[in-house]
Regions:
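N-terminal nucleotide-binding beta1-loop-alpha1 segment
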Residues: 1-19, 23, 375-382
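Short catalytic helix/loop segments, enriched in acidic residues and glycine
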Residues: 22-35
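Short, acidic, metal-binding catalytic loop of nucleotide-sugar glycosyltransferases
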Residues: 38-44
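Short phosphate-binding loop-to-helix
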Residues: 52-106
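Conserved core of the sugar-phosphate nucleotidyltransferase
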Residues: 86-88, 98-172, 287-308, 318-320, ...
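Conserved alpha/beta core of the MobA/IspD/sugar-nucleotide pyrophosphorylase nucleotidyltransferase superfamily
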Residues: 136-249
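Core alpha-helical transmembrane segments of integral membrane proteins
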Residues: 216-298
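Generic detector of multi-pass transmembrane helix bundles and their immediately adjacent loops
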Residues: 300-388
Length: 388
């Protein structure tokens, strides 16, 4: 059964701009958007964001989340929370400005009953809220409906998150302790400024994601590791994934020009660079906890690469190779490659590298024939290899 998530977006950041913590830039989006996506990935089916004032930045964040199919609502008072919060499922509570690794969010998402994520009292946990003499709240809690509505029935102007946590402590909620290494390495932090947000985002990028999108062919062995490094750098520079993807499309289109001018190897190199940029855009989406696109935007750079392969070959074999490679590309992107291992998948980048080597040796015609045989073998692996 799903659960609700309650986020907070009311505390000011420590920056001179005076903006909200929740609106700090984090992993290509606002911090509260990242929290919402974490909760959804852990199993939340609706998001409530407690606010004191609705700012344009918060409204835009809600619009972006809604566009991705996430049910989200801004809540300004306790009356609205009592009316809208579900009474039959638990709620995942996240502190204002808290960034916790996805593993901890998933753990509390799978927990049952009142549960607190805590850290032992130490210098590393000093920014966190103290809950007793020996521990502090690490910014994440699972709250039962009884505790939530018992607290909401109280009258007064108070901090909902902290009041819920204190009520959970008084009722003896189960505690999950965060290792001190997570605090030191940024996997559990309370972000108060943009500088802190950037540092924690670097830690998130270094740790990677637990559900990285699978790839086959040369993408798996070469492009994914390179995109991991490039994605971390682009995230630090706050470059949106959409801009990188558009750049990949533009570069792939430009690469067709030298191919038409008979500078085939130069065009192939540009196409490989375009495919690497597209993979980097996917990496940025993963870091932001967004699902990589599965529609036409995902297929423009590799599709143009296949067009380049046809233009360079100029034969029916080249057309057949591009068509079969296109089918394999869709199967790889949509995870319909069955039990085929990554090295069994012939992707557009794999074909380009094979043809680059053949072209450098003056054996371009033979390269197309070998690539066609490899495509047939790859299709056979997808169709015939026994599924687990």
């Amino acid at each position: 059964m799903g659960f609700a998530a309650i986020l907070s977006a009311s505390r000011a950041s420590a920056d001179s701009s005076g903006g909200l913590r929740a609106c700090l830039h984090f992993a290509g989006q606002t911090l509260v958007e990242y929290q919402a996506r974490q909760a959804v990935r852990a199993g939340a089916d609706r998001i409530f964001i407690m606010v004191s004032v609705i700012t344009p930045a918060l409204s835009q964040a809600v619009d972006r989340l809604s566009a991705d199919g996430i049910a989200v609502a801004l809540v300004r008072d306790m009356v609205s929370m009592v009316r809208d919060a579900p009474r039959d499922v638990d709620a995942l509570l996240m502190a204002d400005g808290a960034i916790v690794s996805q593993a901890h969010v998933d753990s509390l998402g799978a927990a049952e009953g009142d549960t607190l994520l805590v850290a032992d009292d130490s210098r590393a946990s000093a920014p966190l809220e103290r809950i007793d003499a020996g521990q502090r709240w690490a910014g994440l809690a699972r709250i039962s409906p009884a505790l939530l509505f018992g607290t909401l029935d109280m009258i007064g102007d108070w901090d909902l998150a902290l009041t819920l946590v204190r009520s959970a402590v008084q009722k003896g909620a189960r505690r999950v302790t965060v290792p001190e290494a997570d605090l030191l390495e940024g996997r559990a932090a309370l972000v108060e400024s943009q500088q802190q947000a950037d540092l924690v985002a670097q830690a998130v990028a270094s740790a990677g994601t637990t559900r990285a999108h699978a790839r086959g062919g040369i993408e798996h062995y070469l492009f994914v590791p390179l995109a991991r490094s490039a994605g971390s750098m682009l995230m630090r520079l706050q470059v949106p994934a959409l801009q990188v993807r558009i750049g990949a499309m533009a570069l792939a289109a430009i690469a067709l020009v030298p191919i038409e001018l008979a500078w085939v190897l130069t065009g192939f190199c540009l196409l490989l660079l375009a495919l690497l940029l597209a993979e980097s855009a996917d990496r940025l989406d993963e870091l932001a906890l967004r699902r990589p696109p599965q529609g036409w935007t995902a297929f423009v750079p590799p599709g143009l690469a296949l067009v380049g392969i046809v233009l360079a070959g100029g034969t029916t074999t080249a057309v057949d190779l591009a068509l079969l490679s296109g089918v394999l590309m869709v199967a790889d992107r949509w995870r319909r490659s069955g039990a085929a291992a990554p090295w069994m998948m012939l992707t557009p980048a794999s074909v380009l590298i094979l043809l680059l080597v053949a072209g450098a040796l003056g054996l371009m015609g033979e390269g197309y024939r070998v690539a066609m045989l490899a495509a047939i073998a790859s299709a056979a692996a997808v169709i015939l290899r026994p599924r687990a």
